[in-house]
UniProtKB/Swiss-Prot annotation:
Keywords (A to Z) from UniProt: Calvin cycle, Carbon dioxide fixation, Chloroplast, Photorespiration, Photosynthesis, Plastid, Transit peptide
Compartment(s) of residence: Plastid, Chloroplast
Top-level taxon of origin: Eukaryota
HAMAP family: RuBisCO_S_bact
One MF annotation (Gene Ontology) recorded for this entry: ribulose-bisphosphate carboxylase activity
Protein name (record): Ribulose bisphosphate carboxylase small subunit, chloroplastic 1
Entry's family note: Belongs to the RuBisCO small chain family.
Subunit composition and interactions: Heterohexadecamer of 8 large and 8 small subunits.
An individual GO BP term: reductive pentose-phosphate cycle
Functional summary from the UniProt entry: RuBisCO catalyzes two reactions: the carboxylation of D-ribulose 1,5-bisphosphate, the primary event in carbon dioxide fixation, as well as the oxidative fragmentation of the pentose substrate. Both reactions occur simultaneously and in competition at the same active site. Although the small subunit is not catalytic it is essential for maximal activity.
Species for this entry: Lemna gibba
Length: 173
């Protein structure tokens, strides 16, 4: 077999002076064996007057709901953006409503179906929905039918069989 000199690549030997060889960790001789005890607390760092105390959330009257509840009420445009996010992730939008926006126990001391963990579904899940305006229209319809109820939108992943997002779309006044 005949090999052309133009086709043969030239091999250069590796240069050893480019990177130093790994010699392991530094020896413990470089580190002090004993430490001097520092009992002088005046040398501790201090933030001085820069500290401002945070208040706790009031336990009465200002309850928090679900995702995004720390924000002001969402506008229709904000709701549409959230629903678009839900649809981009291939989640099925569902609309639910409830008189109470919180978990409560009314019928029994032990948890059960009617203790507020499950909300009533508004119609059927919106399988095949591709437009946020369809979901917003259903929310508006639920608000008209039940103006004194909370309305929320959930995103259900039908492949994993889990609820992936849930947020309040309407709070009664």
């Amino acid at each position: 077999m005949m090999v052309s000199t133009a086709a043969v690549a030239r091999v250069r030997p590796a240069q050893t002076n480019m990177v130093g060889a790994f010699n392991g960790c530094r020896s413990s001789v470089a580190f002090p064996a004993t430490r001097k005890a520092n009992n002088d607390l005046s040398t501790l760092p201090s933030s001085g007057g820069r500290v401002s105390c945070m208040q706790v959330w009031p336990p009465e009257g200002l309850k928090k709901f679900e995702t995004l509840s720390y924000l002001p009420p969402l506008s229709v445009e904000d709701l549409a953006k959230e629903v678009d996010y839900l649809l981009r992730n291939d989640w099925v939008p569902c609309i639910e409503f409830s008189k109470e926006g919180f978990v409560y126990r009314e019928n029994n001391a032990s948890p059960g179906y009617y203790d507020g963990r499950y909300w009533t579904m508004w119609k059927l899940p919106m399988f095949g929905c591709t437009d946020a305006s369809q979901v917003i229209a259903e929310v508006e319809e639920a608000k008209k039918a039940y103006p004194e109820y909370f309305v929320r939108i959930i995103g259900f992943d039908n492949k994993r069989q889990v609820q992936c997002i849930s947020f309040i779309a309407y709070k009664p006044t």
